[in-house]
Amino acid sequence: MSSVPAPREYFLDSIRAWLMLLGIPFHISLIYSTHSWHVNSATPSWWLTLFNDFIHAFRMQVFFVISGYFSYMLFLRYPLKRWWKVRVERVGIPMLTAIPLLTLPQFILLQYVKEKTENWPTLSAYEKYNTLAWELISHLWFLLVLVILTTVSIGIFTWFQKRQETSKPRPAAISLVRLSLIFFLLGMAYAAIRRIIFIVYPAILSDGMFNFIVMQTLFYVPFFILGALAFIHPDLKARFTTPSRGCTLGAAVAFIAYLLNQRYGSGDAWMYETESVITMVMGLWMVNVVFSLGHRLLNFQSARVTYFVNASLFIYLVHHPLTLFFGAYITPHISSNLIGFLCGLIFVMGIALILYEIHLRIPLLKFLFSGKPPVKQESRAAIG
């Protein structure tokens, strides 16, 4: 445990918040894309589909690198049990709160919008369970994965810490080229695991909890660990915060490959396995692109940025049902996809900010949506 706090990483705080808020245009553009979703516009937009695909191809990979970075930073600051408790509470409590308050009403709304209420009694017990797993976890899946990664990383982080204490500090002798090869092989390994499961027991890939707990965790654990390693080795972090033309070009080529796979791939063939390899390496390269841009443009303290950093999780949690409501009841009345997209951003962001301000004034809701216990008056006085 370290009593010396690490310097504030303003650009990482900002990037994490903007990646979270990017979920709003991502889901609104999904309404107007060629991808089949809960709600879709009458005519899809090719440029909103392209925009949606671009966000989807890298956003969460970069997010989990930042999560791993901050998780290990806090691991060094707190005793093990307290670290695990704090980390799990910060993500677990908002997730458990959002299920009855957000995703359950969202599920009921979709049952009526898609006229599936009459079919519900005819479903088997497993079909009901699996439907609820997909619909109630919904956009909260990354919080569940963070709880799992926090628990799994106890042993890994402990090993990292012991190595730091017993070994002499030395640079992380690994180039971006070598990292790219490692992540390519990790993508191949993930693809092989998925293909084996597809051959042996394909039905399990449609199981919601298996997808969230096993498949998503397996895919994102390398990025989470990479974030921790970036904290341990400043020279590794410097590789990500220094612009790399190779990473930028590589990410562009990978995105083109991603689009071609989406266009010509088949789910019954190798489409998903190919996508996992592409998004694994593209995610790594986009860490460099996003970190270097963020380090140059966002590495400063600002009251406005701090506001959105603090608000980003709440806004992300509430934006999904608001987006679906907009798509179901307002989108059909707007003929222009561009105007509909812009109206959706204003509608969702505006209501989300109002709800955020309301919840700040209700201590119970503030705790439930942040996982942070209220600060005692004595503590405030001591700090101030």
From Swiss-Prot:
Membrane topology: Multi-pass membrane protein
Secretion signal span: none
TM stretches of this protein: 17-37, 54-74, 91-111, 140-160, 173-193, 212-232, 240-260, 274-294, 311-331, 338-358
Superkingdom in the source lineage: Bacteria
Swiss-Prot/TrEMBL keywords: Acyltransferase, Cell membrane, Membrane, Transferase, Transmembrane, Transmembrane helix
Record's subcellular location: Cell membrane
Pfam families, A to Z: Acyl_transf_3 (PF01757)
Coiled coil ranges: none
Pathway note: Glycan metabolism; osmoregulated periplasmic glucan (OPG) biosynthesis
InterPro entries associated with the record: Acyl_transf_3_dom (IPR002656), Glucan_succinyl_AcylTrfase (IPR050623), Glucans_biosynth_C (IPR023723)
One GO process term, biological-process aspect: glucan biosynthetic process
GO terms for MF: acyltransferase activity, transferring groups other than amino-acyl groups; transferase activity, transferring one-carbon groups
Listed GO CC annotations: plasma membrane
The enzyme's E.C. designation: 2.1.-.-
HAMAP family: MdoC_OpgC
Task of the protein: Necessary for the succinyl substitution of periplasmic glucans. Could catalyze the transfer of succinyl residues from the cytoplasmic side of the membrane to the nascent glucan backbones on the periplasmic side of the membrane.
Assigned protein family: Belongs to the acyltransferase 3 family. OpgC subfamily.
Protein name per the record: Glucans biosynthesis protein C
Source species of the chain: Salmonella paratyphi B (strain ATCC BAA-1250 / SPB7)
Gene that encodes it: mdoC
